[in-house]
């Protein structure tokens, strides 16, 4: 029963997110890059955002 609830919740969230067309992915990418340059205490969290990974993420989001 719990798995069905999780799947149903994921489905609803996915359907809502797929309808959002006004997301400006460039602003999202710039925000992530800005976080990389500032706040050294958050650096560990953003360590996986290397330039290659950011480029791949940006490409994937634009293709979406």
From Swiss-Prot:
Subcellular location: Secreted
Propeptide residue range(s): 40-64
One GO CC term on file: extracellular region
Modified residues (Leucine amide): 36
Signal sequence segment: 1-22
Expression by tissue: Expressed by the venom gland.
GO BP terms, alphabetized: regulation of defense response to virus
Recorded superkingdom: Eukaryota
Keywords: Amidation, Antimicrobial, Antiviral protein, Cleavage on pair of basic residues, Secreted, Signal
Summary of the function given for this chain in its UniProt record: Antimicrobial peptide.
Family, per entry: Belongs to the non-disulfide-bridged peptide (NDBP) superfamily. Short antimicrobial peptide (group 4) family.
Additional information: Shows a low ability to inhibit hepatitis C virus (HCV) infection in Huh7.5.1 cells.
Protein's UniProt name: Peptide Ctri9677
């Amino acid at each position: 029963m719990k798995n069905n609830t999780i799947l149903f919740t994921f489905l609803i969230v996915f359907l809502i997110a797929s309808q959002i067309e006004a997301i400006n992915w460039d602003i999202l990418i710039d925000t992530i890059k800005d976080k990389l340059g500032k706040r050294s205490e958050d650096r560990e969290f953003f360590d996986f955002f290397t330039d290659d990974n950011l480029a791949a993420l940006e490409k994937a989001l634009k293709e979406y």
